[in-house]
């Protein structure tokens, strides 16, 4: 059975909330880093999210893939931009990155369908 990528982010949210409550200083610092990194400067936020997706594939983090696919889509990334980024991740990560790139593409398809109101 194929993973439900939107479902994965939904499943993680309560656990992330618990983590924020249990380690508030660490999570506030992490949030501050994320905000600083994602602020548009030389690269816009969309580009940074697409880069983060490529890194997520290269480091083989399914949870990261789910969150960064959604963020890239929400920032206006296109399927072609995501595919080009996945190609770069595959180039750098070889075989295992091919498998995680397929995860990212499945996540993109599901989040894109959800955004347009389709049930996946």
Question: What are the residue ranges of the model-derived segments?
Answer:
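Short alpha-helical scaffolding segments that buttress acidic/His motifs in well-ordered protein cores
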Residues: 30, 34, 50-57, 85-90, ...
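General structural signal for alpha-helix termini and helix-helix connectors
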Residues: 36-39, 70, 74, 91
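Alpha-helical scaffolds flanking conserved acidic
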Residues: 45-50, 79-85
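Iron-sulfur (Fe-S) cluster-binding segments and ferredoxin-like electron-carrier domains
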Residues: 67-79, 105
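C-terminal structural segments of small proteins and small subunits
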Residues: 83-109
């Amino acid at each position: 059975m194929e993973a439900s990528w939107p479902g994965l982010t939904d499943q993680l949210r309560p656990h992330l909330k618990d983590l924020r409550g249990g380690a508030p200083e660490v999570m506030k610092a992490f949030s501050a880093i994320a905000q600083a990194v994602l602020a548009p400067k030389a690269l816009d936020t969309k580009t940074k999210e697409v880069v983060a997706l490529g890194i997520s594939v290269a480091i083989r983090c399914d949870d990261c893939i789910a969150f960064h696919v959604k963020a890239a889509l929400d920032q206006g990334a296109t399927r072609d931009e995501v595919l080009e980024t996945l190609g770069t991740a595959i180039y750098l990560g070889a075989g295992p990155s091919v498998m995680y790139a397929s995860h990212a593409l499945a996540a993109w398809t599901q989040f894109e369908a959800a955004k347009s109101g389709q049930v996946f």
